[in-house]
Amino acid sequence: MIELGRRGVFWFTDTLDKTQLIDLVQRCEQLRYSALWYPEVLSYECFSLGSFLLAHSEKLIIASGIANIYARDPTAMRQGQHTLGKLSGGRFLLGLGVSHSLLVEDMRGHQYRRPLATMRAYLEGMVKAAAAFPALSEPSPIVLAALGPQMTALGGERTAGVHPYNVTPEHTASARAIIGRDKWLCVEQKVLLVAEPSKAREIARQAMAFYLPLPNYRNNWKRLGFTDEDLDNGGSNRFLDAMVAWGTETAVNQRIQAHFDAGASHVCIQPLHPEGQPIPDYNALTALAP
């Protein structure tokens, strides 16, 4: 059974080569973070990368944040989850998500369907696969990438919890109210140890550029009270400050604690580099370690 601690790390692993990946996973383990989360976007395939990270660590939980359900059918997903979980001694946590139409239709050539119905059917397919093949029936936890209330509710009903990304402590409180007290609420939070406002916001704007055009995120940000003016032209200061916890170590820790106070069971920090480079800030990881 996976024991997920309070602090983990998230990183966009597509930016790292072999040596950098090994360095990242081993430093996370040395600093006693509970888990390392990674996405499936442009380069590395989810289970291949998960296997590599597990092979270069001993105790760290390796978590997909998230595996794209359009990349494989439910049986293949269950097989991948089972394989990495069994061969790692239970250190693999599968996060699932519907991804985004840009990454599904333009990149993969699939039709992007209604997210909630598609995810519900996919989870049912994984259950059927486990029932059909006894080797796949061992219980293994799943968390759902969830932004809106309906997907969050589905995660609370059908999985071990949810993994919100690009959210605020207010969203965390809402998600906790939906899923109940006993489910995992694994929140991603970008952090930046830069105290000068203009520099911090420049780096934050760079970090958010990929996400700002995506409808799933924009819809959720509007539910949180942001306007089109906040989200256009690279993001307003108010929006950037809400997405990236920047400033001193004390200020950043206060934001992380705000998520815990709102009901998060686990916060995975994404340590943006103070010079905007596409590599983790290991000084931040050290300063913010559990």
PLM feature spans:
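Active-site-adjacent structural elements that line small-molecule/cofactor binding pockets in enzymes
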Residues: M1-P290
